[in-house]
Amino acid sequence: FKQKTAYEISLGLVGSEMCIRDSPSIQPIKNNDLTRIASGFGMRTDPFDKSRKMHKGMDFSAPRNTPVYAASNGIIVRADSRSTGYGKHIRIDHGYGFVTLYAHLNSYNVKRGQTVKKGDIIGFVGNTGRSKGLHLHYEVIKDGRSVNPVNYFYGNLTPEEFDEVLRISVQENQSLD
């Protein structure tokens, strides 16, 4: 996959400028040096039972309370502190079948029903729920199915940076959740 392919995916959303504007298109944490990706989408080793399982998102390692940003415009459909595998987590509905999930947060500053804009700070990195270390678990869900988030990072990466993120994200490793 190249950034051109990700761009073509975004063009496949054509039919509505709003659809493109509101689809997730940026990384959910600052990753200027591209060193934050701890685990990518796909089959990974579970850190708890060491079995191979589908990892439905990407893990970004970061210090506690690193800001987490909304990947696009949307409405908060869940801001939950219940004790689940995701720990403290947020779900944003972006419309057009897109939902993003931000998990294992230390805290969040949004509530259900709130409208957010791309780049708004919505929470802070933590280690809650079924987690083996400080990180953000990030998922992109399209029409009810988890898809590889890296394909939606076309909004804030150069083609060279995109290639590097893609290279890092496909490496076989252990997820943090």
Regions found by a protein language model. Name each.
Residues 1, 19, 133-135:
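Intrinsically disordered, low-complexity regions enriched for glutamine and histidine
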Residues 3-20:
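Short, small-residue-biased leader/transition segments that mark boundaries at the very start
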Residues 16-17, 21-30:
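Long amphipathic alpha-helical scaffold segments
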Residues 7-9, 25-26, 79-80:
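Short, flexible, glycine/charge-rich loop motifs used to bind or transfer phosphoryl groups or to couple energy/partner
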Residues 176-177:
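Short, solvent-exposed mixed-charge patches
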Residues 2-3, 21, 44, 76:
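Generic preference for well-ordered secondary structure
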Residues 29-172:
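Catalytic cores of peptidoglycan-degrading enzymes
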Residues 1-2, 119:
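Short hydrophobic/aromatic segments of transmembrane alpha-helices and their interfaces
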